[in-house]
Amino acid sequence: MKKVLTLTALSAVLLSSTAMASGFHLREQSAAAQGNAFAGATAGAENISYTYFNVAGLTRHKGTQMNLGMSYIAPEAAAKNVHVVNNDGSLGARGSDIHNIVHAAVSPNITVSHQINDKSFIGLAINTPYGMITKYDQEWAGSDHGITSDLKSATITPMFAYKATDKLSLGVGMQIQYVWAHLTNSSMGKQIPVVTSEGNALDFGYQLGALYEFNENTRLGVGYRSQVRHKLKGDMKATMNIPLLNQDISAKLDTPAMFSVGAHHDINDKWSVMAEYQRVFWSSFKNLTFVGDSMNYTGKPYISQVKENWRDTNFWSLGTSYQMDNQWKLRLGVAYDQSAVRFKDRTPRIPDSDRIWYSVGLGYQYNDKLSFDAGYTYIKAHKAKMNTFVTENAANSVNASADYTNSVQIFALSVNYNF
């Protein structure tokens, strides 16, 4: 039997508090843009890190430039009122409140650009656009639903932008994306303490962008990052060295497409305002399914499935910037980030919920070549209730419920150098 592991969105409980974007998308790719809660990121092009949202923005940056950035993501998350019910209706377990489910993480990024001539520009970006790590205690009441969820990624994007007219710029990029996934959970009502599934893949996508400058004060940008369809290869192992569970697996993991549109307007020499809309196409995430080529104790294929049924999400943000003097710039922003998960589809790996961003940032122009940016964001997520069902087969299924609360702080720094 063909081994399949459909991981169309390897995600984890409160991942959105770690990444603070719906699903497992890490929006933190620009310290400058973060100061405005990413308002106008698709049109801003204040430095080359904005090309993550719109590759056409390369044409606003003359000569050769480099941007180095890093975001420190510090989440707080808790699960309360944890209950597990067996398939026969009996109470399987009642767990204590769980804290420190998610852990701090670092998301680095680097972008370089070069102007070929008056119209043509090239660039290269290295980002970590998707990722999370979440870990429950192995003995928690809902361990059949998930213990550890770990997803890491790296994307290299060669870019090209062309100034078609004095007002219109167009850009294209190729995403070269690597992902690595690691999942653990108990099985058969904890008779098997830990089952580990792990895999990795390297696949490709693309990026498109357009930037229209109405005048020197007003510009509008449109960006698109394609879905990347990954085919992971790896293995599944059980801690008790059970041959039926120790086997090679293949996997499908699709990172979603994203469309964005942004506007930026300079009111005067001091004040600027900006707005952003982003849509992430999570609706391709229908279920999380493990199917092995060996039989379980019932004589049927080993199957573990959780229906996800994610929806496409919307992200809205508004921001303003104030140029305090020739060197210092103050940035402010607020955003509303919609959850990809509906109540009926929440799981311990993905109890996502809507959230609000509050951001502030500073820019410092040291000289004509060197500048620095810093951003801080506090994100408060709505309380998330979960009541979910997972099954390996008709004889072994459990229901888990819990209440989740989470928030996060994000600190971002970057340095930009114009050679």
Language-model-detected regions and their locations in the chain:
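Gram-negative bacterial Sec-dependent N-terminal signal peptides
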Residues: 1-21
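A generic secondary-structure signal marking the coil-to-beta-strand transition
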Residues: 17, 32, 62-66
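Extreme N-terminus of proteins, especially the signal/transit-peptide cleavage junction
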Residues: 18-20, 27, 60
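Outer-membrane beta-barrel porins/channels
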Residues: 22-37, 41, 79, 84-97, ...
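Short strand-turn segments of transmembrane beta-barrel domains in outer membranes
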Residues: 38-41, 65-74
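Outer-membrane beta-barrel pore proteins
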Residues: 41-45, 51-64, 112-116
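Glycine-rich nucleotide phosphate-binding loop and flanking beta-alpha elements
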Residues: 59, 74, 130
